[in-house]
Each structure stands twice: as C-alpha cells, then as structure tokens.
UniProtKB/Swiss-Prot annotation:
Lineage: Bacteria, Bacillati, Bacillota, Clostridia, Thermoanaerobacterales
Name of the protein in question: Argininosuccinate synthase
A single Gene Ontology CC term: cytoplasm
Pathway info: Amino-acid biosynthesis; L-arginine biosynthesis; L-arginine from L-ornithine and carbamoyl phosphate: step 2/3
GO molecular function, one term: ATP binding
UniProt record similarity statement: Belongs to the argininosuccinate synthase family. Type 1 subfamily.
EC nos: 6.3.4.5
Binding site for L-citrulline: 88, 93, 124, 128, 177, 186, 262, 274
Protein localization: Cytoplasm
SUPFAM superfamilies assigned to the protein according to its UniProt record, in alphabetical order: Adenine nucleotide alpha hydrolases-like, Argininosuccinate synthetase, C-terminal domain
Database matches in InterPro entries: Arginosuc_syn_C, Arginosuc_syn_N, Arginosuc_synth, Arginosuc_synth_CS, Arginosuc_synth_type_1_subfam, AS_cat/multimer_dom_body, Rossmann-like_a/b/a_fold
UniProt-annotated binding residues for L-aspartate: 120, 124-125
Species for this entry: Thermoanaerobacter pseudethanolicus (strain ATCC 33223 / 39E) (Clostridium thermohydrosulfuricum)
Record's catalysed reaction(s): L-citrulline + L-aspartate + ATP = 2-(N(omega)-L-arginino)succinate + AMP + diphosphate + H(+)
C-alpha cells in the first residue's frame, strides 16, 4: 500500500479528478500532490490551485507547457500530416504524452512512488498515460481509480462530490466530458452518445456555428518554413500566439468542427465532437503546399506514413522507436515545404485560394493548353505504348486462346 507515501495526481479540476483527491486519501491514506499541466485550458485554470487544496491536496503544481506543446508535439504531428480516421486532428492524443512526461518529472522531484489519473477504463487516455509513463520510468506505480472504485457513472461521481462538499462544473443535465487545450476542444457523453442526435448549437466553445458565421468570406495567408507555420497575414508570430490567432480567425468563420464516430484503441466505437479551428486551417494549408513542392513518389509514401503516424499517436505510442523513425522520414520531406498559402473561409468551409513557393515543382510551360516550346506531344505515343504494354499482351494472349478454343470446338 501507499500509506503515508506521495502520489502525484494528473489534476484538471474537472469532475473526475475533483473526486479522485478525497477518494485517494480515503482509500490509500496517501499524500496527494496535484499536478495541473497547462496545455492551454484557459479560464478553467483560474481557481484550480485553491480548488485542489480545498479538495485535500497537500501541494499543487501548475506548469505552463503551451510552447513545448506546440513546438514538440503539435508541429511534428502537423508536418507528418497525421489525421486519425480522416477527421480527428489528435488534440487529446498529442497532449497526453507531454502531460505524462511532466507527471514523471514531478514524481521524481517529489520522491513520489505513484501517479494517479482520472481516465476511465473504457477510454484511450488510460493507455496513453500509462504507456507513456512506463516508457519514461517503468518503476512508477499507477493508480487508475475508474478501474477500481464503486462509482460506475458520472452521475455517481456528482453524488460523491456533493457528499464531500466539492464544487464541480458538471450537472445532471449537462454531463459532457470535455477536454480543452490550445489545439482543440472535445465533447463526449450526454446526448452525444446517440449518433443520431445533432450537436446542440450551444455545445461549441470556440467556434461560431457555421450557419451563424459571417455572410462575407474572409481570407487568411499562412506562411511556412520547412513545414512549420511562421506567419499569419504577413505577421511573424511565436508558436503559441500563431495558434491563438488562427483559432480566432477560423472560429469566427465556423471552421473546424468534426463530428466523428471513431474506433477506440480498446475495441469499441465512440462519438466525439471536436473543435479544432487553427488545426483545420494549418492542415489544409500545409497539404496545399505539399501538393506544390513534393514529388509524386514522396507524396504517395508520405500518405502511408501519415496514417501510421496518426495510429501511433492515437494509440499512445508517442515515445516508441517507430515514431522516432517516422519523424526522421517526415523531417526529410519537409526541407522544401516553404511558401505561402491563401485560404478562403466561409461558413465552415476552407477553400484554397492560392499557393506559392520558391521550391515549387509546378512548371506552367509544361502543362499549358496554349502554345509551348518545351513539350513534344508526339512523345506521348511511345510512352503510352510502353505503359500499356502488359495489358496489350494480356489481351493478345486471351484472343489467341479464344481462337484456339473455337478451332477445336470447345
């Protein structure tokens, strides 16, 4: 047991972790070190220290890692073009390994033998946290209350919190599970558990519903250097500010909503509604630039890498050797991903409105429908003959066999 020992709790101030503090003290008789890792949660962190102490924590860490989150987690994933199941831009998935890393650092600093988290036994986060923690320090014990305690639902948690006098943001009527960081806001649970239910218009936190967005389109310029966004509308911005600026621009135009029934790592399907305004713009712009500067074979292979990269991140394998190897490949592909992309935003839509790069592989002289001096169209005949030779031979052989069969009366 951990009686008298220190336990570091991944603390968010939400429903799950709010009830975990008194539960751990009651069941383990341990000292709770609450660790809130700031990946851009915003206003919800305002009173989090007082709340954690009032709930029974002996000490509270609040670590601002937004810049590290963008530079070392968001940008590598963006450069990889990783998207899970065609829609999910991995906002929660990317944040978990960074949070796990900081929890391990705090545990080492405090001499704690265990780390606790509030992820449920049905979800992906339990895997992401625990695999990441043990990749960094396999000796640390992990406590996952959701897999142990008698509280079987969020309603049970609300009752427990009221019993312990703990203020919580959730109610019986609004019991969405919300994850909020600089990159996205995710919504799960409640009426969203039925895929037939349309998300309510007041669900969204950072995006204007598309039907309520401005009636006039807005243009935005995004400049990249070696796959990394560096300027918005000609203005150089630090990574965190750049994400915040694009969140505002995309959000007011209704851009960045993804409603997805996804395949969880643990084997079941779940529904999530994601708000990723800046990410939606950056992925769109980055891809348009890659279309311009990458050769065909690299693009095709990178598409395969992007899918595998997304699976690794989603499944909690951020610190795996394979991901490190894929990072090396991705980095090589990004050497010429430099240029400017212009996007047109209108009521939830993102439309390419122009792209340019000093490393463009597009040559207008070769593709023009007008008169040109560089391409001899007669050359296409020989190419077509060789390109289709295998099919031509196959057809000839089939015709010969058919003639032979007819000759012998088959």
């Amino acid at each position: 047991m951990l009686k008298g020992e220190k336990v570091v709790l991944a603390y968010s101030g939400g429903l799950d972790t709010s009830v975990i503090i008194p539960w751990l003290k009651e069941n383990y008789e341990c000292e709770i070190i609450a660790a809130c890792i700031n990946v851009g949660q915003g206003e919800e962190l305002k009173y989090i220290k007082d709340k954690a102490l009032a709930s029974g924590a002996s000490k509270v860490y609040i670590e601002d890692v937004k810049e590290e989150f963008v530079k070392d987690y968001i940008f590598p994933t963006l450069k990889a073009g990783a998207v899970y199941e065609g829609k999910y831009l991995l906002g929660t998935s990317m944040a978990r390994p960074l949070i796990a890393k900081k929890l391990v650092e705090i545990a080492h600093k405090e001499g704690a033998k265990a780390i606790a988290h509030g992820a449920t036994g049905k979800g992906n986060d339990q895997v992401r946290f625990e695999v990441s923690i043990h990749a960094l320090d396999p000796s640390i014990k992990i406590i996952a209350p959701w897999r142990i305690w008698d509280l079987k639902s969020r309603e049970d948690e609300i009752d427990y919190a009221k019993k312990k006098g703990i203020p919580i943001p959730a109610t019986y009527e609004k019991i969405y599970s919300v994850d909020n960081n600089l990159w996205h806001v995710s919504h799960e649970g409640g009426d969203l558990e039925d895929p037939w239910n349309e998300p309510k218009s007041d669900l969204y936190d950072i995006i204007t519903p598309p039907d309520k967005a401005p009636d006039k389109p807005e243009y935005v310029l995004i400049e990249f250097e070696k796959g990394i966004p560096v300027k918005v509308n000609g203005k150089a911005l630090e990574p965190v500010k750049l994400i915040e600026e694009l969140n505002a621009i995309a959000g007011r135009n209704g851009v960045g909503i993804a409603d997805l029934v996804e395949n969880r790592l643990v084997g079941m399907k779940s529904r999530g509604v994601y708000e990723t305004p800046a990410g939606t713009l950056l992925y769109a712009a980055h891809k348009e630039l890659e279309y311009l500067v990458l050769d065909k074979e690299t693009m095709r292979f990178k598409d395969l890498v992007s899918q595998k990269y997304a699976d690794l991140v989603y499944n909690g394998l951020w610190f795996s050797p394979l991901k490190a190897a894929l990072d090396a490949f991705v980095e090589e592909t990004q050497k010429n991903v430099t240029g400017v992309v212009r996007l047109k935003l209108y009521k939830g839509n993102v439309i390419n409105a122009g792209v340019k790069s000093p490393y463009s592989l597009y040559n207008q002289e070769f593709v023009t429908f007008g008169k040109d001096e560089v391409y001899n169209q007669k050359d296409a005949e020989g190419f077509i003959n060789l390109f289709g030779l295998s099919l031509k031979i196959k057809a000839l052989m089939e015709m010969e066999r058919k003639d032979m069969d007819e000759a012998v009366g088959r």
